[in-house]
Amino acid sequence: MRKLLLVVVFVPIGVGLAWWYFHERQLADYAPSYREYAYITNGKSDTVSVIDLRTFQLAKTIRVGIEPTGIAANSKKNEIYVVNTGSNNVSVIDAERNAVVATIGVHGKPYFIDVSLDGKRGYVANSGSANVSVIDLDKRTVIHNVRVGASPGLARVSPDGRTIVVSNRGDGTISEIDAQYLAVRSTIPACQQPEDIAILPDNSKAFVACTGSAQVASIDLTSGKLLALLDVGNTPVHLTLKPDGGELVVSNFDSDSISIIETTTDEVGGSYLIGTHPARGIVTADNSRLYVSNFGSNTVAVYDIDQGKMIAALAVGSHPDGLALSASENYLLVLDSESGDLTVIQKRTPNKKFEPGEYSLLTMIPVGIQPNNIVVKSFILPAEK
């Protein structure tokens, strides 16, 4: 077992005093060929920071295009894709070498990329050119550009790979693209400034956050029709779907709350105060815990889904935004967009009398300027031939 030595630190928060308990941590031993990295886009540094999650150290800083924003990992090959908004292209990173191996030109002002589960295609929403670039990831080339609505923000591919759902912020519509024919199947008038998208595991519905109208739209993907407009809090910016698909959590940035939607019935089950300006969320694989980054209060809220209540508020860096979990889910990774660092929170069972709880700060790692998105990739290095 490797060890990481930490100390006790006191952190003032508001009128109270919160503290993290640090002591000698045991880091897991891994097989020599095992790799696990976090990749972080640094929007104002034009770089990607690579964090080795075996040692929690900066492994490499990779120069990419101008203003990197969106990032995605390929589940079938050891590649990472970085959207460069300022240079209108996508950088392909070989995760085994942690080096850029290709740059793919797309259209104007791309912000987001999604990768099909079979690892064969990438979909990039180009907000400045009102289209979606379809990338053949084996050939590393754009095979088609599909015209959609005004200022598309996201293009999300369904789990079965058959449908791409696009939120068009500029005209309040949702486009459904048929992945086989690479053509728009339906255009759905929805709501004001649609943004984030979540698609159910059974491919039946998509939910879209309407940031301008404090609603979430429910879309039937078979008929291409709007099923419901659900009232939530002000400025819903992010949707977090439980892995089982039963509930959807909405981060209401300007209401300091989350709303929980029952996806089967299209009903809002309740809304709960969670922290100042909740930005993003992530749920554990067993559907038991929700973590929410509170951009305005420099905390991460821990919400127990079974109990239906917040059980902890963890102090992190300045303006926390993007979140990820390690492959084991023993570590929560928090991007602090203003302070330019990665906060690593360890989840473990307390085994000493004076340990305060199951969450503690493991370390904070400096990255680049304005880190905004993070993805984790784990793999076994292939045997040398």
Residues covered by each model-derived region:
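Predominantly soluble domains enriched in secretory-pathway, periplasmic, or organellar proteins
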Residues: 2-385
